[in-house]
Design a protein with these regions (language model features):
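Conserved structural motif at the start of ABC-family nucleotide-binding domains
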Residues: 13-15, 20
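ABC ATPase NBD coupling module
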Residues: 50, 62-77, 237
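Walker B catalytic motif
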Residues: 150-154, 159-161
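Helix-to-loop junction immediately C-terminal to a conserved catalytic motif
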Residues: 44
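Conserved beta-strand-loop-alpha-helix hinge in the C-terminal portion
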Residues: 210, 215, 219, 223-247
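Conserved ABC transporter NBD signature motif
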Residues: 52-61, 111
Length: 257
């Protein structure tokens, strides 16, 4: 709510207000450098992102000053666009720390479904391709099972062959295993217990071929300038670029509701 965030003394987010309902998935569009990743990392609580004004609420609780660990325990999870390599730490050991209730059988079966079993006993992300890193990130988020799933460009570095696998993993992470695409016009009516909330950064919109997204937002220069139907927003961006989005704040076109 009215979130202002600075990084190294530079204000990146300038009054962002965004509400994601329980079980909703929202997409976040915007050009490079607009503040999208800053928003996700601030929600997760990384220390270099300083909230100078406004607040973050989760499940009715003010978590603005909560630590990363506290937010994770409450049910906030994130998958990075460019996850770091961690020397000396295996993926299996990290999962055991972040998801202590998971059995080894659960870890291995989930990894096998993501074609990531061979990475469990390797150093985290060491020597992995972009697509392989994405699979290990999705493995971690599925096993953590957070109530709010934040995905930073899940399509980045993923080839077409693996995109369907990432899409399926995203559905699992968000509790939508039974949903098979965006053609379900009654998705809102079919909500069931177990649906997670999601905030997904996407440039290409490919992930929307695999998930029903309830709403989209365009972030530019640290401010949300458009909100509306995610598919229509994406179509507008593809046709006209982001310059048209500046007009959305006061326009009456259907895409800018």
């Amino acid at each position: 709510e009215d979130l202002h965030v600075s990084v190294m003394g530079h204000e990146v987010l300038k009054g962002v207000s965004l509400e994601i309902g329980e079980g909703e998935i929202h997409a976040l569009f915007g050009p490079n450098g607009s503040g999208k990743t800053t928003l996700l990392n601030t929600v997760m609580g990384f220390s270099r992102y300083k909230v100078t004004k406004g607040a973050i609420y989760f499940k009715g609780q003010d978590i603005t000053r909560a630590t990363i660990d506290e937010r994770a325990r409450l049910g906030v999870g994130i998958s990075f666009q460019r996850p770091p390599t961690v020397a000396g730490v295996t993926l299996r050991s990290l999962i055991s720390l972040s998801s202590p209730s998971r059995t080894n059988e659960e870890i291995e079966s989930t990894a096998e479904a993501l074609d990531a079993k061979d990475f469990l006993d390797r150093e985290i992300n060491a020597g992995l391709s972009g697509g392989e890193m994405k699979r290990t990130e999705m493995l971690q988020i599925i096993l953590q099972s957070p109530a709010l799933v934040c995905l930073d460009e899940p399509e980045s570095g993923v080839d077409l062959q693996n995109m369907s696998l990432i899409g399926k993993a995203a559905r699992t992470a968000l509790g939508r295993d039974s949903f098979d695409g965006t053609n379900c016009r009654h998705a809102m009516k079919l909500r069931r217990a177990g649906y997670k909330s999601g905030l997904i950064i996407t440039h290409t919109g490919q992930i929307m071929d695999h998930l029903f997204v309830d709403k989209g937002h365009v972030l530019m220069n640290g401010e949300i300038v458009c909100s509306g139907n995610a598919s229509e927003l994406l179509s507008e961006i593809r046709d006209h670029g982001y310059t048209e989005c500046f007009r959305c704040a006061g326009c009456e076109r259907g895409v800018c509701k």
